[in-house]
C-alpha cells in the first residue's frame, strides 16, 4: 500500500511538470532554453555547488568537524537527496543523522541535533524575510503573512524539541500515547520509549553544548549565506534568459516557492514547486513561456542535480546506512 501511494505521488509530480510544459508551450520553452546564455547557467550551477559546500561547512561546524569538507559535502547531499524523495522533505534530517553517524562517526542524537538546528535557522530566516515581504509587497501580503506565521510556528516547535528538555519530552510523551494504541507489543513500546527519551535528552544536551553567542552567530551567518546564494542562483537563471528583475523580487519568489515545497505532500515539492515558481514569475510580470523555462532550468540545477549526486553518494554507502537502521529497529524489538 505504501509503495503504491509513493508511486501515485511520484506520478502526480510528473503529471504536474508535464502539464506545466504543455500549458507554457513545449516548442516555446525549447526555443527559450536554446536561446539562453549557457555560460550564466553554468555559473548558476557552480553557485549551487557552492550552496552545498556552505551547508556542508555549517554541518561540520555544528558537529565539530568543519575541516572534513569532502565528507560533510557528501553527508549533506545524501540528506538533501532523502529530503527530495520524501513529502515535506521530512526524511532529510533523519538521513543526515544516519549518514553522519556512518561517515562522520558521530552519535545519532548529535546528527539529529545538528539537522534540527539547521532547519531552525533556515525556517527562522525564511519566516523573517516573508514577514518583511508581507509588509513591503501588498500583492502577496496574505500568502507571505501565512508563510511567515507558519515558519515561526514550526521554528518554535523545533526550539522546544531541540533546546527545551522538559517540553521536548512532554511532546514525545503525547506522541507515545498515540503509538500505544497501535497493535505493538508492550516490550517493544517500552524499548521504544527508553531509546527515544534517552535520544531526546542526548540530542538536547548536545544542542546546549554549542548554544553560545559565538557558535550560534556563525551558524546564523552560514545559514543566511546559503539562503542568499540560492537566491543568487535563481537571479542568474533569470539573467540567462534575458529577464530583468530586482534581486528583492527573486528573494520573495524563492521564499514563497520554498513554502509550497515544504507544505507539499509531493516528494521534495516535485511538480508543485515548478508550477508555483512559474505562477509567481507570471505574477511578477514574466511572460508565460519564459516563466516555465526559468522554473524548469532552476529546478534542474537545484533539485535534479542534487538528487543525482545524492543517489550516487547514497549508492556507495546505502548498505552500511541501512545496516544502522536495521540494528536500531532490532534493538527496539529486542
From Swiss-Prot:
It is a multi-pass membrane protein. It is found in: Cell membrane. Keywords: Cell membrane, Membrane, Transmembrane, Transmembrane helix. GO terms for cellular component: plasma membrane. It holds the Pfam family LPG_synthase_TM. The chain crosses the membrane at residues 7-27, 33-53, 120-140, 142-162, 218-238, 247-267, 277-297, 300-320. It comes from the Archaea. InterPro entries: L-PG_synthase/AglD. PANTHER family: UPF0104 MEMBRANE PROTEIN MJ1595 (PTHR39087:SF2). Belongs to the UPF0104 family. This is UPF0104 membrane protein MTH_378. It comes from Methanothermobacter thermautotrophicus (strain ATCC 29096 / DSM 1053 / JCM 10044 / NBRC 100330 / Delta H).
Amino acid at each position: 500500500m505504501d509503495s503504491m501511494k509513493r508511486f501515485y505521488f511520484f506520478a502526480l509530480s510528473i503529471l504536474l511538470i508535464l502539464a506545466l510544459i504543455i500549458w507554457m508551450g513545449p516548442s516555446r520553452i525549447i526555443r527559450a532554453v536554446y536561446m539562453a546564455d549557457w555560460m550564466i547557467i553554468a555559473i548558476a550551477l557552480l553557485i549551487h555547488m557552492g550552496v552545498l559546500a556552505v551547508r556542508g561547512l555549517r554541518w561540520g561546524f555544528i558537529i565539530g568537524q568543519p575541516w572534513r569538507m569532502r565528507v560533510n559535502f557528501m553527508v549533506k547531499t545524501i540528506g538533501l537527496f532523502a529530503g527530495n524523495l520524501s513529502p515535506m522533505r521530512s526524511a532529510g534530517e533523519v538521513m543526515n543523522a544516519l549518514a553522519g553517524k556512518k561517515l562522520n562517526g558521530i552519535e545519532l542524537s548529535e546528527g539529529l541535533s545538528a539537522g534540527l538546528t539547521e532547519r531552525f535557522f533556515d525556517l527562522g530566516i525564511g519566516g523573517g524575510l516573508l514577514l518583511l515581504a508581507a509588509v513591503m509587497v501588498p500583492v502577496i501580503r496574505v500568502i507571505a503573512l501565512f508563510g511567515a506565521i507558519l515558519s515561526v510556528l514550526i521554528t518554535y516547535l523545533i526550539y522546544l524539541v531541540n533546546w527545551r528538555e522538559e517540553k521536548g519530552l512532554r511532546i514525545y510523551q503525547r506522541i507515545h500515547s498515540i503509538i500505544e494504541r497501535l497493535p505493538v507489543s508492550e516490550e517493544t513500546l517500552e524499548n521504544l520509549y527508553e531509546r527515544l527519551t534517552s535520544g531526546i535528552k542526548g540530542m538536547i544536551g548536545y544542542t546546549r553544548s554549542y548554544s553560545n553567542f559565538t557558535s550560534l552567530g556563525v551558524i546564523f551567518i552560514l545559514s543566511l549565506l546559503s539562503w542568499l546564494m540560492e537566491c543568487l542562483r535563481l537571479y542568474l537563471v533569470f539573467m540567462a534568459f534575458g529577464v530583468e528583475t530586482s534581486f528583492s523580487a527573486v528573494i520573495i519568489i524563492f521564499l514563497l516557492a520554498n513554502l509550497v515545497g515544504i507544505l507539499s505532500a509531493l516528494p521534495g515539492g516535485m511538480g508543485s514547486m515548478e508550477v508555483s515558481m512559474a505562477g509567481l514569475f507570471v505574477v511578477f510580470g514574466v511572460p508565460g513561456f519564459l516563466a516555465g523555462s526559468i522554473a524548469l532550468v532552476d529546478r534542474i540545477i537545484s533539485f535534479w542535480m542534487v538528487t543525482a549526486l545524492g543517489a550516487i553518494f547514497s549508492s556507495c554507502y546505502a548498505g552500511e546506512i541501512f545496516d544502522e537502521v536495521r540494528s536500531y529497529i532490532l534493538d527496539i524489538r529486542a
